[in-house]
Amino acid sequence: MIPLVYETTSRILSLNSMHYLGRLTGCTECTVEESRNADYTLNASVVKNSECANSVVIQNYICAKPNPTDEPQFFEIYKVVEKNNVLSIKTKHIKHNCYNNILAAGETSAQLYSPAEAYENLDALFDNNYVFSSDITDRKNIKLGFTQVCTLGDFLGGAEGSLLDLFHGEYKWNNFNVSFLKSRGKKRAYRLKWGDNISSYEKTQSSETTISHVCAYATVYDEFSKQDIQIIADPYEIFEQKSKTNKLQVYPVPDKLVDGITVNSSSGDGYEFVKNTCRIAAMAYIGGDKLGEIKSNIKVDAEAVLDDMQQFNLCDTVTVILSDSIAAESKIVKTTYDTLREQYKQLELGSFKTKLSDFVK
């Protein structure tokens, strides 16, 4: 697909506000990268004096296919560098415009909402045309956007207490349509095997995440001293780990777990409850695979393999068999798509991680 260039006729973005300017026939390179629940960008190179190159200016938009199956997406131009009669263009998907809209917090306490209910009740400063949907029906106490001022982007997934932080779903964007899903992608009956269709992979182990203990603490209000104090729980020991010395990871318990809880340092009331909360938080932290990771990153770039995977999408799952006979399922966590050639340049699979939840006393 030859990329198209547009300008907007309104500060309130919508598909109807996009005014078509022409085709970038002088485009020599156009690559779209999308990462799971993260950045969504397009980089392009255009010959300076080619058709519509004069329309390649910041805050105009490039429309291009991001992968073999999705509709063309709009990307806002935010940087243009001219060198040797070539324009190097950097853009970001219109989803990033969510960070330019503030949510006015008007509530005095957190609201119990499902993701769709929460979005419906937001009070945004600027009108917008994002259409939100979700198949997640669980309800949780949500502060962001209700008791805490934040941007729309922070509310969706850019901060602690966001929908992504609370519900752990996966986003799929189709221009202004936002889908927040329990799980995105399909399980594919496809195997990547060392020595067969994997030519290389990278395994990284770091002592920074190899520890012996996790020590969680919480900050709560003391009714006796009339001030916030910190209560620490006994460290959880992780055994069968590779740490040969005592190596402690200090973990602050998220405020949302102890919100509204008070203690009395004179009588001791509330202390055991808070310590138990710290212990549970430490267990969840360890079980969440944030520690002791051995990462095996696989990047698929061989054309023959990419041909087999052309109809795959971000978050699809495949089976990987490595040289040490380890077999595991892994999600596609990043796609790099050549819009001009209409094929993937690279697919990156998620890391395999050592699970520490089985090693906790």
Task: Label every PLM stretch briefly.
Residues 2, 6-10, 76-98, 134-223, ...:
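Short beta-strand-centered interaction patches in the first periplasmic/extracellular domains
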Residues 1-26, 35, 207, 347-361:
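Trimeric viral appendage architectures of receptor-binding fibers, tailspike depolymerases
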Residues 29-31, 37-40, 119-149:
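N-terminal export/assembly leaders
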Residues 61-74, 221, 320-329:
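Ser/Thr/Gly-rich low-complexity blocks that favor extended beta-strand/coil architectures
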Residues 89-91, 224-272, 276, 293-361:
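Acidic, low-complexity/disordered segments
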Residues 32-44, 282-299:
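Short, basic/aromatic beta-hairpin or loop at an interaction surface
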